[in-house]
């Protein structure tokens, strides 16, 4: 059986309660509520005072017992003081029981108080919780991202290239619907690199086609990021916007496409310049002489009269020019020519010893032919 007795004494007013015609019902309810709130506040205040008094009394009892114990343990403690503390402890325990009784009476009184509109119910929840998508975990390391990209490309490179060659919106949407795994960052990264490769190879028309598909994938990824959803769940929304001729969206797409193509051209130019520098450095290293000097650089650093001697390949003319120069300068320039491999002592005569420094009076030198785009200045 359900006990309904708890409902017998509820201090609430019904809107249908009869009141005197000269009494405003709303005001009457307001006065009753105010009086009820004041009674509740007074009751709560008395309860808090009793609680504080009880705690203070318990603290005094504990303090008195501590002093009593210390005095009993101490040798030569005063008997008079001991008796006084015992009497005080006994009195405090009586007060403690009195406070506890008052608190118990207060609890009973609170339990028997009639319910009202303010105490009928209590908040079950003070806040609402909504499940949200967890924040993306910390980005993987550079090596992990590179490995992920490499694995993805090895598996789907053919499909990515097929997507990059598509022209029509409908074809792109259908292909992504059939190969939804392509809607990801790895596809976009591969298309970007492919665009740069095509520009380096001077396949400009094909680069512009692939650049268009690259921006399609980039816009899908940006849309997913703004909606905070998986790109595979929103790529159809991108095509819907584009195909319904959303003018502002289309203009934004075209602007980003042109900016992307300019960036691709810039990156391709930098790559070509870097490759040229690397090639030139390799060629320079190949032509370094036995002393580690570049013959082209040495030739360009020679005085004009010595350069003419190399241009006409005339040994006698070179010896005459050297004899007219300052001996120190002549020795410096000829030693650089030998270290660069531009000239070597005449091995046929055997008169020039290996490793001997060349000077103005060294007549036994022969030109060494140079390969490639270097000047052929052999005697």
Curated annotation (Swiss-Prot):
Keywords tagged on the record: Acetylation, Chaperone, Cytoplasm, Phosphoprotein, Ubl conjugation
Modified residues (Phosphoserine): 13, 121, 378
Modified residues (N-acetylvaline): 2
Residues bearing the modification N-acetylmethionine: 1
Chain coiled-coil ranges: none
GO cellular component, one term: protein folding chaperone complex
Localisation: Cytoplasm
Keyword Metal-binding in annotation: no
GO terms classed as biological process: positive regulation of type 2 mitophagy; post-transcriptional regulation of gene expression; protein folding; protein stabilization; regulation of type I interferon-mediated signaling pathway; regulation of type II interferon-mediated signaling pathway
Primary site of residence: cytoplasm
Keyword Phosphoprotein tagged: yes
Record PTM: Constitutively sumoylated by UBE2I.
Role noted for this protein: Co-chaperone that binds to numerous kinases and promotes their interaction with the Hsp90 complex, resulting in stabilization and promotion of their activity. Inhibits HSP90AA1 ATPase activity.
Family, as annotated: Belongs to the CDC37 family.
Annotated protein name in UniProt: Hsp90 co-chaperone Cdc37
Lineage of producing organism: Eukaryota, Metazoa, Chordata, Craniata, Vertebrata
